[in-house]
């Protein structure tokens, strides 16, 4: 009975560990940056300075679409065109303060406020 129990425990333990590893790998750390921490963090991370605190630079390729919002998705088919566009460009209205102080943000979101390398 002891050997059977160990085998059964292993059959449960291995898939559980694999699932845990996959879940941890997909988690991206978020942070809240308020007060002096926000401009200090931007200054340290952004080599060429950072953009205005009210909006980020527009990315002409994807027009700041929300990550994971695919064209012709079920949500898009259910909503009207204006609702879809509002969802896609929601972040255009929010500034770094809205994203990183009122809510928490990821490092990738902070870096999107960095100014581009100046053209020479």
Curated annotation (Swiss-Prot):
It is found in: Secreted. GO terms for cellular component: extracellular region; extracellular space. Residues 51-89 form a propeptide. Pfam families: Insulin (PF00049). Its main location: secreted. It comes from the Eukaryota. Expressed at a high level in seven cells of each larval brain hemisphere that may correspond to neurosecretory cells. GO terms for molecular function: hormone activity; insulin receptor binding. Transmembrane segments: none annotated. The keyword DNA damage does not apply. Residues 1-29 form the signal peptide. Disulfide bonds join 34-101, 46-114, 100-105. Keywords: Cleavage on pair of basic residues, Disulfide bond, Secreted, Signal. Heterodimer of a B chain and an A chain linked by two disulfide bonds. Possible ligand of InR/insulin-like receptor. Belongs to the insulin family. This is Insulin-like peptide 3. It comes from Drosophila melanogaster (Fruit fly). The gene is Ilp3.
């Amino acid at each position: 009975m002891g050997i059977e129990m160990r085998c059964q425990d292993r059959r449960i333990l291995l898939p559980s560990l694999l699932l845990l590893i996959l879940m941890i790998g997909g988690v991206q750390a978020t942070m809240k940056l308020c007060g002096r921490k926000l401009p200090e963090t931007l200054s340290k991370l952004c080599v060429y300075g950072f953009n205005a605190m009210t909006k980020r630079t527009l990315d002409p390729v994807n027009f700041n679409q929300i990550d994971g919002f695919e064209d012709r998705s079920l949500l898009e088919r259910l909503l009207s065109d204006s609702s879809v566009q509002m969802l896609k460009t929601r972040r255009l209205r929010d500034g770094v303060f809205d994203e990183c102080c009122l809510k928490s943000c990821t490092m990738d979101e902070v870096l999107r406020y960095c100014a581009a390398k100046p053209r020479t």
